[in-house]
Amino acid sequence: VQTSPLIAKYLDDLAAEDEVVTAARDASVELGITPIAPAVGAQLAAIAAATQAGAILEVGTGAGVSGLWLLRGAPGATLTSIDTELDHQQHARAAFGRAGIPVTRARLITGKARDVLPRMNEASYDIVLIDADPASMLEYVEHALALVRVGGSVLVAHALMGGRVADPAQRSDEVADLRGLLKELSTSDAVRAAVSPVGDGLLQIVRLPEPV
């Protein structure tokens, strides 16, 4: 069950967003993007800090809300972010500039993730965040697990799909795919995974060392 509206508002209010993130959030809405909730952003920052992330990959740049939170948590990290929409990335680039993030710390790639991900170096990232087309989520997770280093995390935003994943009456392909993934992850020896109900849900998949 998703977090109640009262608790969700409380957690979002706790996650203090500065003017730069607020402006990026407003830009997201204007562009028709559904940004992560402030509480999810705070969780991303905490994970990035705990991981001491140096290299972060993001699938779905949006207007920069997620990227700002991740780089807040890992101020020494470099972010590589993929999106099909150049307009979105231009807004993100402007947001990063307003936050004082050097251009060298935010590499934006305009293109389809399914074309870009296979060309990236395996085991090179501390965090891979997926916040993109739900229909391609399984494909992106498969690539992400190869790209993240041992001990690193693959994060999937909007992992509860507006509560649909928990509703037995919902049987779309996207929902079925996510349910299947969650079930597979729960019994896997290669990863540890958990879903946080904060916001619209955040799935964290930690890559484990191969058994000796």
Residue ranges, per PLM feature:
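A short alpha-helical cap/connector motif
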Residues: 1-127, 134-153, 159-212
